[in-house]
Amino acid sequence: MVFKKVLLTGTSEESFTAAADDAIDRAEDTLDNVVWAEVVDQGVEIGAVEERTYQTEVQVAFELDGSQ
């Protein structure tokens, strides 16, 4: 089997977990054969915004077609 990894950043005004879910949900909606995800980094945007925005960087792996 051969896998490809992509790095995605999900965002949420609620929590880091919701931000990770945002990235994983998007990956599952747009990629086939998603197998696993790893949280790489987390951060909070606190600059010129009224509310904090949680960001979770997620590395998502999916199996390439015909890789068996």
From Swiss-Prot:
Keywords: Cytoplasm, FAD, Flavoprotein
Binding site for riboflavin: V35, W36, Q55
InterPro entries the UniProt entry points to: Dodecin (IPR009923), Dodecin-like (IPR025543), Dodecin-like_sf (IPR036694)
Location within or outside the cell: Cytoplasm, Cytosol
Site features described as May contribute to ligand binding selectivity, chain residue numbers: E45
Induction cue: Up-regulated upon transition to the exponential growth phase (at protein level). Not up-regulated at the RNA level.
GO cellular component, one term: cytosol
Complex and partners: Homododecamer; four homotrimers assemble to form a dodecameric hollow sphere. Except for FAD, flavin dimers are bound between subunits with a stoichiometry of 6 flavin dimers per dodecamer. In contrast, FAD molecules are bound as monomers, where each FAD molecule forms intramolecular stacking interactions between the adenine group and the isoalloxazine group.
Function: May function as storage protein that sequesters riboflavin and related compounds, thereby protecting the cell against undesirable reactions mediated by the free flavins. Binds and sequesters riboflavin, lumiflavin and lumichrome. Can also bind FAD and FMN (in vitro), but has low affinity for FAD and even lower affinity for FMN. Protects bound flavins against light damage; Trp-36 rapidly quenches the flavin excited state. Promotes the conversion of bound riboflavin to lumichrome.
Family the UniProt entry places it in: Belongs to the dodecin family.
Name this protein carries in UniProt: Dodecin
Taxonomic lineage from the root: Archaea, Methanobacteriati, Methanobacteriota, Stenosarchaea group, Halobacteria
